[in-house]
């Protein structure tokens, strides 16, 4: 199963990532530990909405 995530630092989106469940969980742990960020799992439609709204800015 594929998972998608938004990574936030200081309230700002800094990365969008996805991967199969095991890889996603490893990447999430690495990002949180290394960069002290928050990760929120999101659905694929959320990614499309977020990137589309950023293109309009």
From Swiss-Prot:
The protein's name in its UniProt record: Uncharacterized protein YjzG
């Amino acid at each position: 199963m594929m998972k998608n995530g938004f990574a936030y630092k200081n309230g700002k989106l800094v990365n969008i990532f996805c991967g199969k469940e095991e890889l996603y969980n490893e990447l999430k742990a690495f990002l949180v530990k290394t960069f002290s960020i928050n990760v929120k799992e999101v659905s694929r439609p959320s990614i499309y909405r977020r990137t589309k709204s950023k293109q309009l800015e």
